[in-house]
Amino acid sequence: MAEDKGVKNMLEHLVKNLLVEDVEEIELRNVTIELDELELDLKTVAQTLPVEIWERILKPEVEEKEREVEVPEYEPPVEEYEGCVAEVQIGATRSDGGSRDRVVVLGGERAYFPFEEPRPNPPVVTFDVFDTPDVGIPGPIREELGDVIEDPVDWARTVVKRYGVDIVTVHLVSTSPKLHDAPVEEAMETLEDILDAVKVPIIVGGSGDPEKDVEVFVKAAEVCEGERVMLSSINEDMDFERVVEAAKEHGHVVLTFAPVDVNLMKSLNKKVLNRGLSKEDVVMDPTTCALGYGIEYTIDVMTRIRLAALKGDEHLQMPISSGSTNAWAAREAWMKEESWGPREYRGPLWEAVTATTVALCGADLLMMFHPWAVQVVMEAMEYMAEGRVTGDAYVTDVIA
Protein backbone atom coordinates (compact mmCIF):
# COMPACT_ATOMS: atom_id res chain seq x y z
CA MET A 1 0.00 0.00 0.00
CA ALA A 2 2.85 2.36 0.83
CA GLU A 3 4.46 1.71 -2.53
CA ASP A 4 1.19 2.38 -4.37
CA LYS A 5 0.76 5.61 -2.48
CA GLY A 6 4.30 6.63 -3.31
CA VAL A 7 3.78 6.01 -7.00
CA LYS A 8 0.56 7.97 -6.90
CA ASN A 9 2.23 10.92 -5.23
CA MET A 10 5.04 10.83 -7.76
CA LEU A 11 2.67 10.85 -10.72
CA GLU A 12 0.59 13.69 -9.26
CA HIS A 13 3.78 15.67 -8.77
CA LEU A 14 4.83 15.07 -12.36
CA VAL A 15 1.46 16.01 -13.83
CA LYS A 16 1.24 19.13 -11.68
CA ASN A 17 4.66 20.31 -12.81
CA LEU A 18 3.70 19.48 -16.36
CA LEU A 19 0.69 21.79 -16.24
CA VAL A 20 2.30 24.58 -14.23
CA GLU A 21 5.53 24.79 -16.18
CA ASP A 22 3.95 24.40 -19.63
CA VAL A 23 5.88 21.21 -20.22
CA GLU A 24 4.55 19.59 -23.35
CA GLU A 25 6.43 16.31 -22.94
CA ILE A 26 7.99 14.37 -20.06
CA GLU A 27 10.33 11.42 -20.45
CA LEU A 28 11.15 8.93 -17.72
CA ARG A 29 14.44 7.05 -18.06
CA ASN A 30 15.49 3.88 -16.30
CA VAL A 31 12.15 3.71 -14.55
CA THR A 32 10.11 0.58 -14.31
CA ILE A 33 6.60 0.71 -12.93
CA GLU A 34 4.83 -2.55 -12.30
CA LEU A 35 1.16 -2.05 -11.55
CA ASP A 36 -1.92 -4.16 -11.95
CA GLU A 37 -4.00 -1.06 -12.66
CA LEU A 38 -3.15 2.60 -13.27
CA GLU A 39 -5.69 5.34 -12.68
CA LEU A 40 -4.87 9.05 -13.04
CA ASP A 41 -7.22 11.49 -11.36
CA LEU A 42 -6.44 14.83 -13.01
CA LYS A 43 -9.33 16.54 -11.23
CA THR A 44 -7.33 16.47 -8.02
CA VAL A 45 -4.44 18.22 -9.71
CA ALA A 46 -6.64 20.64 -11.62
CA GLN A 47 -8.42 21.79 -8.50
CA THR A 48 -5.14 22.81 -6.95
CA LEU A 49 -4.12 25.14 -9.78
CA PRO A 50 -4.23 28.87 -9.07
CA VAL A 51 -6.65 31.08 -11.05
CA GLU A 52 -3.82 32.79 -12.94
CA ILE A 53 -2.62 29.40 -14.17
CA TRP A 54 -6.09 28.53 -15.42
CA GLU A 55 -6.32 31.89 -17.21
CA ARG A 56 -3.00 31.17 -18.83
CA ILE A 57 -4.10 27.71 -19.88
CA LEU A 58 -7.50 28.71 -21.21
CA LYS A 59 -6.50 31.96 -22.88
CA PRO A 60 -5.54 31.33 -26.51
CA GLU A 61 -2.05 32.42 -27.44
CA VAL A 62 -3.38 34.21 -30.51
CA GLU A 63 -6.72 35.95 -30.39
CA GLU A 64 -8.96 35.01 -33.26
CA LYS A 65 -9.76 37.91 -35.52
CA GLU A 66 -13.11 38.34 -37.17
CA ARG A 67 -12.78 37.23 -40.71
CA GLU A 68 -14.64 39.04 -43.44
CA VAL A 69 -16.32 36.55 -45.71
CA GLU A 70 -16.74 37.78 -49.22
CA VAL A 71 -20.26 36.96 -50.39
CA PRO A 72 -20.45 36.72 -54.16
CA GLU A 73 -23.22 38.70 -55.82
CA TYR A 74 -26.06 36.44 -56.91
CA GLU A 75 -27.12 36.69 -60.50
CA PRO A 76 -30.22 34.70 -61.44
CA PRO A 77 -29.88 32.57 -64.56
CA VAL A 78 -31.42 34.65 -67.32
CA GLU A 79 -32.30 32.92 -70.56
CA GLU A 80 -32.92 34.53 -73.90
CA TYR A 81 -35.90 33.30 -75.89
CA GLU A 82 -36.42 33.48 -79.61
CA GLY A 83 -40.20 33.68 -79.43
CA CYS A 84 -42.79 35.82 -77.65
CA VAL A 85 -46.48 35.78 -76.80
CA ALA A 86 -48.76 37.87 -78.98
CA GLU A 87 -50.59 40.82 -77.46
CA VAL A 88 -54.37 40.55 -77.71
CA GLN A 89 -56.65 43.53 -77.14
CA ILE A 90 -60.17 43.03 -75.86
CA GLY A 91 -62.54 45.98 -76.08
CA ALA A 92 -62.56 49.05 -78.28
CA THR A 93 -62.81 52.71 -77.33
CA ARG A 94 -64.48 55.40 -79.43
CA SER A 95 -61.24 56.05 -81.26
CA ASP A 96 -61.24 52.37 -82.27
CA GLY A 97 -64.86 52.41 -83.38
CA GLY A 98 -66.34 51.07 -80.15
CA SER A 99 -67.97 52.52 -77.04
CA ARG A 100 -65.81 51.12 -74.22
CA ASP A 101 -64.07 53.52 -71.84
CA ARG A 102 -60.98 51.29 -71.66
CA VAL A 103 -59.39 48.27 -73.27
CA VAL A 104 -57.65 45.24 -71.82
CA VAL A 105 -54.41 43.94 -73.32
CA LEU A 106 -53.29 40.38 -72.65
CA GLY A 107 -49.99 38.64 -73.29
CA GLY A 108 -46.82 40.13 -74.72
CA GLU A 109 -44.44 38.04 -72.60
CA ARG A 110 -40.89 37.62 -73.86
CA ALA A 111 -39.61 35.58 -70.91
CA TYR A 112 -40.96 32.98 -68.52
CA PHE A 113 -39.69 34.23 -65.16
CA PRO A 114 -40.28 37.84 -64.05
CA PHE A 115 -36.61 38.21 -63.05
CA GLU A 116 -35.71 37.51 -66.67
CA GLU A 117 -38.06 40.21 -67.93
CA PRO A 118 -41.18 41.64 -66.25
CA ARG A 119 -44.53 40.82 -67.80
CA PRO A 120 -45.56 43.78 -69.97
CA ASN A 121 -49.23 43.18 -69.18
CA PRO A 122 -50.08 41.70 -65.76
CA PRO A 123 -52.80 39.04 -65.50
CA VAL A 124 -56.32 40.46 -65.63
CA VAL A 125 -59.32 39.34 -63.57
CA THR A 126 -62.71 39.12 -65.26
CA PHE A 127 -65.88 38.73 -63.19
CA ASP A 128 -68.35 36.01 -64.20
CA VAL A 129 -71.95 37.14 -64.71
CA PHE A 130 -74.77 34.76 -65.70
CA ASP A 131 -77.96 35.73 -67.52
CA THR A 132 -79.96 33.50 -65.17
CA PRO A 133 -79.41 32.58 -61.52
CA ASP A 134 -80.61 29.02 -62.20
CA VAL A 135 -77.14 27.60 -62.72
CA GLY A 136 -76.26 26.26 -59.30
CA ILE A 137 -74.49 29.31 -57.95
CA PRO A 138 -72.65 28.28 -54.74
CA GLY A 139 -74.22 29.46 -51.50
CA PRO A 140 -71.29 31.64 -50.35
CA ILE A 141 -71.46 33.60 -53.61
CA ARG A 142 -75.22 34.01 -53.42
CA GLU A 143 -74.89 35.28 -49.86
CA GLU A 144 -72.23 37.81 -50.81
CA LEU A 145 -73.83 39.16 -54.01
CA GLY A 146 -77.42 39.13 -52.81
CA ASP A 147 -80.32 40.02 -55.08
CA VAL A 148 -78.20 41.38 -57.93
CA ILE A 149 -77.85 37.84 -59.32
CA GLU A 150 -81.53 38.00 -60.30
CA ASP A 151 -80.77 40.66 -62.93
CA PRO A 152 -77.70 40.20 -65.15
CA VAL A 153 -77.58 43.89 -66.03
CA ASP A 154 -77.58 44.92 -62.38
CA TRP A 155 -75.08 42.15 -61.67
CA ALA A 156 -72.66 43.45 -64.29
CA ARG A 157 -73.08 47.04 -63.15
CA THR A 158 -72.46 46.07 -59.52
CA VAL A 159 -69.24 44.14 -60.09
CA VAL A 160 -67.77 47.01 -62.10
CA LYS A 161 -68.70 49.77 -59.66
CA ARG A 162 -68.27 47.91 -56.37
CA TYR A 163 -65.27 45.73 -57.12
CA GLY A 164 -63.50 47.71 -59.83
CA VAL A 165 -63.00 44.95 -62.38
CA ASP A 166 -61.76 45.98 -65.82
CA ILE A 167 -63.64 43.34 -67.80
CA VAL A 168 -66.82 41.28 -67.41
CA THR A 169 -67.73 37.83 -68.74
CA VAL A 170 -71.41 37.44 -69.62
CA HIS A 171 -72.42 33.77 -69.74
CA LEU A 172 -75.59 33.35 -71.83
CA VAL A 173 -76.42 30.01 -70.21
CA SER A 174 -80.18 30.52 -70.50
CA THR A 175 -79.84 29.48 -74.15
CA SER A 176 -78.94 25.91 -73.16
CA PRO A 177 -81.50 23.34 -74.38
CA LYS A 178 -80.99 21.63 -71.01
CA LEU A 179 -81.91 24.77 -69.05
CA HIS A 180 -84.35 27.36 -70.45
CA ASP A 181 -83.54 26.96 -74.15
CA ALA A 182 -83.99 30.72 -74.49
CA PRO A 183 -84.05 32.05 -78.06
CA VAL A 184 -80.82 33.57 -79.33
CA GLU A 185 -82.62 36.89 -79.93
CA GLU A 186 -83.64 37.05 -76.27
CA ALA A 187 -80.05 36.46 -75.17
CA MET A 188 -78.90 39.22 -77.52
CA GLU A 189 -81.25 41.69 -75.84
CA THR A 190 -79.60 40.92 -72.51
CA LEU A 191 -76.18 41.32 -74.07
CA GLU A 192 -77.07 44.70 -75.58
CA ASP A 193 -78.46 45.92 -72.24
CA ILE A 194 -75.20 44.98 -70.52
CA LEU A 195 -73.15 46.73 -73.22
CA ASP A 196 -75.16 49.88 -72.50
CA ALA A 197 -74.96 49.52 -68.70
CA VAL A 198 -71.21 49.06 -68.35
CA LYS A 199 -68.39 50.46 -70.44
CA VAL A 200 -65.70 47.91 -69.72
CA PRO A 201 -64.71 45.26 -72.29
CA ILE A 202 -67.03 42.26 -72.52
CA ILE A 203 -66.45 38.53 -72.94
CA VAL A 204 -69.44 36.67 -74.36
CA GLY A 205 -69.82 33.15 -72.99
CA GLY A 206 -72.21 30.47 -74.18
CA SER A 207 -73.99 27.63 -72.45
CA GLY A 208 -71.66 24.80 -73.37
CA ASP A 209 -74.06 23.31 -75.91
CA PRO A 210 -71.99 22.76 -79.09
CA GLU A 211 -74.85 23.49 -81.49
CA LYS A 212 -76.59 26.35 -79.74
CA ASP A 213 -73.34 28.10 -78.89
CA VAL A 214 -72.43 28.44 -82.56
CA GLU A 215 -75.67 30.32 -83.20
CA VAL A 216 -75.16 32.45 -80.10
CA PHE A 217 -71.59 33.42 -81.02
CA VAL A 218 -72.36 34.16 -84.66
CA LYS A 219 -75.21 36.46 -83.66
CA ALA A 220 -73.22 38.03 -80.81
CA ALA A 221 -70.40 38.85 -83.22
CA GLU A 222 -72.89 40.78 -85.33
CA VAL A 223 -74.60 42.53 -82.41
CA CYS A 224 -71.29 43.56 -80.83
CA GLU A 225 -69.62 44.76 -84.02
CA GLY A 226 -67.02 47.40 -83.26
CA GLU A 227 -66.75 46.50 -79.56
CA ARG A 228 -64.09 43.79 -80.03
CA VAL A 229 -65.55 41.29 -77.58
CA MET A 230 -64.13 37.84 -76.95
CA LEU A 231 -66.30 34.86 -77.90
CA SER A 232 -65.86 32.17 -75.25
CA SER A 233 -65.28 29.45 -76.26
CA ILE A 234 -64.82 27.26 -79.35
CA ASN A 235 -63.59 23.67 -79.51
CA GLU A 236 -63.18 20.75 -81.90
CA ASP A 237 -66.62 19.33 -81.05
CA MET A 238 -68.52 22.22 -82.63
CA ASP A 239 -68.71 23.95 -85.99
CA PHE A 240 -66.06 26.39 -84.84
CA GLU A 241 -65.26 27.49 -88.39
CA ARG A 242 -68.50 29.51 -88.50
CA VAL A 243 -67.57 31.27 -85.28
CA VAL A 244 -64.08 32.02 -86.59
CA GLU A 245 -65.53 33.51 -89.78
CA ALA A 246 -67.94 35.68 -87.77
CA ALA A 247 -65.15 36.89 -85.49
CA LYS A 248 -62.97 37.72 -88.48
CA GLU A 249 -65.79 39.57 -90.24
CA HIS A 250 -66.78 41.69 -87.25
CA GLY A 251 -63.38 42.19 -85.64
CA HIS A 252 -63.61 40.10 -82.48
CA VAL A 253 -61.40 37.73 -80.46
CA VAL A 254 -62.05 34.01 -80.02
CA LEU A 255 -61.18 31.80 -77.07
CA THR A 256 -60.04 28.32 -78.08
CA PHE A 257 -60.55 25.48 -75.62
CA ALA A 258 -58.86 22.08 -75.23
CA PRO A 259 -59.06 19.57 -72.35
CA VAL A 260 -55.66 19.61 -70.61
CA ASP A 261 -53.64 18.53 -73.64
CA VAL A 262 -50.86 20.52 -75.28
CA ASN A 263 -51.18 18.78 -78.64
CA LEU A 264 -54.96 19.26 -78.81
CA MET A 265 -54.53 22.91 -77.92
CA LYS A 266 -51.90 23.36 -80.59
CA SER A 267 -53.99 21.55 -83.20
CA LEU A 268 -57.06 23.73 -82.63
CA ASN A 269 -55.03 26.93 -82.67
CA LYS A 270 -53.42 25.89 -85.93
CA LYS A 271 -56.82 25.33 -87.53
CA VAL A 272 -58.08 28.69 -86.32
CA LEU A 273 -55.02 30.49 -87.68
CA ASN A 274 -55.39 28.68 -90.99
CA ARG A 275 -58.94 30.08 -91.20
CA GLY A 276 -57.57 33.60 -91.32
CA LEU A 277 -57.42 34.85 -87.73
CA SER A 278 -54.09 36.16 -86.47
CA LYS A 279 -52.40 35.36 -83.18
CA GLU A 280 -53.55 38.80 -82.02
CA ASP A 281 -57.16 37.61 -82.35
CA VAL A 282 -56.87 34.40 -80.32
CA VAL A 283 -56.73 33.54 -76.61
CA MET A 284 -56.49 29.90 -75.50
CA ASP A 285 -57.89 27.98 -72.55
CA PRO A 286 -56.07 24.67 -71.87
CA THR A 287 -58.48 23.94 -68.97
CA THR A 288 -58.09 24.84 -65.31
CA CYS A 289 -58.44 21.98 -62.86
CA ALA A 290 -59.35 23.08 -59.36
CA LEU A 291 -57.01 23.08 -56.40
CA GLY A 292 -56.97 19.54 -55.05
CA TYR A 293 -58.73 18.20 -58.14
CA GLY A 294 -55.92 17.97 -60.67
CA ILE A 295 -54.41 21.44 -60.62
CA GLU A 296 -51.00 19.80 -61.08
CA TYR A 297 -52.06 18.80 -64.61
CA THR A 298 -52.98 22.40 -65.37
CA ILE A 299 -49.64 23.60 -64.00
CA ASP A 300 -47.82 21.14 -66.25
CA VAL A 301 -49.79 21.98 -69.41
CA MET A 302 -49.67 25.77 -68.98
CA THR A 303 -45.95 25.68 -68.25
CA ARG A 304 -45.23 23.56 -71.31
CA ILE A 305 -47.40 25.77 -73.51
CA ARG A 306 -45.72 28.96 -72.39
CA LEU A 307 -42.19 27.59 -72.73
CA ALA A 308 -43.01 26.23 -76.19
CA ALA A 309 -44.30 29.65 -77.21
CA LEU A 310 -41.13 31.36 -76.03
CA LYS A 311 -39.05 28.80 -77.89
CA GLY A 312 -40.78 29.73 -81.13
CA ASP A 313 -43.91 27.57 -81.54
CA GLU A 314 -46.21 30.03 -83.31
CA HIS A 315 -49.30 27.88 -82.75
CA LEU A 316 -48.97 28.35 -78.98
CA GLN A 317 -47.95 32.02 -78.94
CA MET A 318 -51.29 33.30 -77.65
CA PRO A 319 -52.29 34.55 -74.19
CA ILE A 320 -53.67 31.93 -71.79
CA SER A 321 -57.08 32.17 -70.14
CA SER A 322 -58.03 30.34 -66.96
CA GLY A 323 -61.51 29.40 -65.81
CA SER A 324 -60.50 29.84 -62.18
CA THR A 325 -64.17 29.70 -61.27
CA ASN A 326 -63.76 25.93 -61.66
CA ALA A 327 -62.37 25.99 -58.12
CA TRP A 328 -65.99 25.88 -56.95
CA ALA A 329 -66.31 22.39 -58.40
CA ALA A 330 -64.26 21.22 -55.43
CA ARG A 331 -66.58 20.15 -52.64
CA GLU A 332 -64.13 21.59 -50.11
CA ALA A 333 -64.98 25.04 -51.48
CA TRP A 334 -68.73 24.98 -50.88
CA MET A 335 -69.80 21.97 -48.80
CA LYS A 336 -71.04 22.52 -45.26
CA GLU A 337 -68.61 20.54 -43.13
CA GLU A 338 -67.83 21.92 -39.69
CA SER A 339 -64.48 20.15 -39.40
CA TRP A 340 -63.27 21.95 -42.55
CA GLY A 341 -63.92 25.40 -41.15
CA PRO A 342 -66.48 28.02 -42.24
CA ARG A 343 -67.24 27.65 -45.93
CA GLU A 344 -67.71 31.40 -46.39
CA TYR A 345 -63.92 31.61 -46.00
CA ARG A 346 -63.00 28.28 -47.58
CA GLY A 347 -64.67 28.99 -50.91
CA PRO A 348 -63.00 32.29 -51.79
CA LEU A 349 -59.66 31.01 -50.48
CA TRP A 350 -59.97 27.94 -52.72
CA GLU A 351 -60.69 30.13 -55.74
CA ALA A 352 -57.99 32.68 -54.94
CA VAL A 353 -55.29 30.02 -54.54
CA THR A 354 -56.37 28.35 -57.78
CA ALA A 355 -56.23 31.63 -59.70
CA THR A 356 -52.90 32.74 -58.24
CA THR A 357 -51.34 29.36 -58.99
CA VAL A 358 -52.23 29.44 -62.68
CA ALA A 359 -51.17 33.08 -62.94
CA LEU A 360 -47.70 32.05 -61.79
CA CYS A 361 -47.69 29.42 -64.55
CA GLY A 362 -48.45 31.93 -67.30
CA ALA A 363 -52.21 32.56 -67.29
CA ASP A 364 -53.02 36.07 -68.56
CA LEU A 365 -56.79 36.14 -67.98
CA LEU A 366 -58.47 34.85 -64.81
CA MET A 367 -62.21 34.21 -64.92
CA MET A 368 -63.46 34.46 -61.33
CA PHE A 369 -66.67 34.42 -59.32
CA HIS A 370 -66.49 35.35 -55.62
CA PRO A 371 -65.96 39.05 -54.78
CA TRP A 372 -63.47 38.34 -51.96
CA ALA A 373 -61.39 36.10 -54.20
CA VAL A 374 -61.51 38.71 -56.95
CA GLN A 375 -60.23 41.44 -54.63
CA VAL A 376 -57.42 39.32 -53.22
CA VAL A 377 -56.22 38.14 -56.62
CA MET A 378 -56.40 41.63 -58.15
CA GLU A 379 -54.11 42.84 -55.36
CA ALA A 380 -51.81 39.86 -55.89
CA MET A 381 -51.58 40.59 -59.62
CA GLU A 382 -50.75 44.21 -58.86
CA TYR A 383 -48.00 43.02 -56.55
CA MET A 384 -46.65 40.75 -59.28
CA ALA A 385 -46.64 43.64 -61.72
CA GLU A 386 -45.14 46.35 -59.53
CA GLY A 387 -43.45 44.48 -56.70
CA ARG A 388 -45.59 46.20 -54.10
CA VAL A 389 -49.09 46.20 -52.65
CA THR A 390 -51.04 49.44 -52.77
CA GLY A 391 -53.94 48.17 -50.70
CA ASP A 392 -54.83 45.36 -48.33
CA ALA A 393 -54.03 42.10 -50.08
CA TYR A 394 -54.70 40.01 -46.99
CA VAL A 395 -57.72 37.75 -47.10
CA THR A 396 -58.61 38.54 -43.50
CA ASP A 397 -58.69 42.26 -44.25
CA VAL A 398 -60.86 41.77 -47.33
CA ILE A 399 -63.26 39.59 -45.38
CA ALA A 400 -63.42 42.08 -42.52
UniProtKB/Swiss-Prot annotation:
Protein name: Acetyl-CoA decarbonylase/synthase complex subunit delta
Gene3D superfamilies: Dihydropteroate synthase-like
Its job: Part of a complex that catalyzes the reversible cleavage of acetyl-CoA, allowing autotrophic growth from CO(2). Probably maintains the overall quaternary structure of the ACDS complex.
Record family assignment: Belongs to the CdhD family.
Pfam family, one: CdhD
SUPFAM superfamilies (UniProt xref): Dihydropteroate synthetase-like
Parts of the chain that traverse the membrane: none
Biological process (GO), any one: one-carbon metabolic process
InterPro entries from the UniProt entry: Ac-CoA_synth_d_su_TIM-brl, ACDS_complex_subunit, CO_DH/Ac-CoA_synth_dsu, Dihydropteroate_synth-like_sf
Subunit structure: Heterodimer of delta and gamma chains. The ACDS complex is made up of alpha, epsilon, beta, gamma and delta chains with a probable stoichiometry of (alpha(2)epsilon(2))(4)-beta(8)-(gamma(1)delta(1))(8).
